[in-house]
Amino acid sequence: MRRYQFTSESVTEGHPDKVCDQISDAILDGILEKDPTARVACETLVKTGMAVVAGEITTSAWVDMPVVVRNTIKDIGYTDAAMGFDYETCAVLTAIEKQSPDISRGVTEGEGLFKEQGAGDQGLMFGYATDETSELMPSPISYAHRLARKLADLRKSKKLDWLRPDGKTQVTIEYEDQTPVRVSAVVVSTQHSPEVKHKTIVDAVRSLIIEKCIPAKLMDKSTKIYVNPTGRFVVGGPFGDAGLTGRKIIVDTYGGMGRHGGGAFSGKDPTKVDRSACYYARYVAKNVVASKLAARCEVQIAYAIGVAQPVGVHVNTFGTGRVGEDVLEKYIMQNFDMRPKAIIEQLDLLKPIYRKTAAYGHFGRDEFTWEKTDRAAKLAEDLLRPTLAAVPATTNGAGSKNGSGSKKEPKRKGKKETGAQA
């Protein structure tokens, strides 16, 4: 029996990097609404008094980018020049060119070396799922997102009118083997107006945010709670720190539990496998866990630019699988179509849905198509039949008696945590 800690963080929508993600995805949505086949790679930088939008966009649509930028900043909550950054007075600069024809020919059917629509770039993408929460996400990132969203809700409802848009949260969970047993530390840092006292902030965050978001049974006298541990957080947002699109990729995914291939999501249309293949890898991994074939599952997909079929698929069930990983890999490759065009069609990715993804995580939210578990029953039916379950595995030790190809499934204590969804 091993006890260990794991920590994940989240940020609010007013964090400067998240401001950029939301601007990039708001521009993407504005274009896709008028031209679903557009090619978009849109990056944003924000700093005091300015926002810069740059990238490569090929489209028949016209979008008033400065208006989209300002409306997004306004929606987030930067409405007062006293914060050092606001939607009315900030300058908006744009530097946009068309997509490179050398890239376009690999993504456009019939133009490259291969007939099919190929991947928009080479790269490796990961998807992950675990049964420790109802949304099949790791507990630390689920609770961190929940805290961050609660900060924004209380600010926007004006229940805590001294809150400002920038903020960060962090949760450390103590595990026994693979089961979360307690919260060992919580950190909440929130931007605030200058007149509010530190004790007022601490008391409100404890009672209205932490105690509302984290189950009491996971907290104890030894749980460490830190609220604005520097004692003051007035200067924040783009006034305090420069922001860039794509700098919160761990917040966007699994909080560090489950690997990341390095590609960011926001501002990219779904021909970019950095985005669409990560969504699909999550879809596959979540269906595996929902089918009870494994308690944890990580799926890696890798592509070559301009080529439709992935060059590699890898499945890891971390010793929790009920069938061998080689059996699972073979089944996934035969039954889940991972070509970029097929992913886009299966997950319905040409709609303007992306602004919503750009804060509080891309995964663990039922509103998105890649969170469906519509393949779980079929997976269980096909792979838990005795004839298939008996197939010897070779992935993590050939010829194991239980046919799992991995370590014996650990006993998981207690009921799994639920209600961690942001």
UniProtKB/Swiss-Prot annotation:
Residues the entry annotates as binding L-methionine: 56, 99, 241, 272
Disulphide bridges: none
Cofactor note: Binds 2 divalent ions per subunit.
Positions annotated to bind K(+): 43
Source species, domain of life: Bacteria
Pathway: Amino-acid biosynthesis; S-adenosyl-L-methionine biosynthesis; S-adenosyl-L-methionine from L-methionine: step 1/1
Cofactor: Mg(2+); K(+)
Residues binding ATP, per UniProt: 15, 166-168, 232-233, 241, 247-248, 264, 268
Gene Ontology cellular component terms for the protein in this record: cytoplasm
Molecular function, one GO term: methionine adenosyltransferase activity
Start and end residues of each stretch annotated as Disordered: 390-422
Xref: SUPFAM superfamilies: S-adenosylmethionine synthetase
UniProt entry tagged with the keyword ATP-binding: yes
Keywords from the UniProt entry: ATP-binding, Cytoplasm, Magnesium, Metal-binding, Nucleotide-binding, One-carbon metabolism, Potassium, Transferase
Subcellular location per the Swiss-Prot or TrEMBL entry: Cytoplasm
Substrates-to-products reaction catalysed: L-methionine + ATP + H2O = S-adenosyl-L-methionine + phosphate + diphosphate
GO biological process: one-carbon metabolic process; S-adenosylmethionine biosynthetic process
Annotated function: Catalyzes the formation of S-adenosylmethionine (AdoMet) from methionine and ATP. The overall synthetic reaction is composed of two sequential steps, AdoMet formation and the subsequent tripolyphosphate hydrolysis which occurs prior to release of AdoMet from the enzyme.
Membership in a protein family: Belongs to the AdoMet synthase family.
Record-given protein name: S-adenosylmethionine synthase
Organism name: Sorangium cellulosum (strain So ce56) (Polyangium cellulosum (strain So ce56))
Gene label: metK
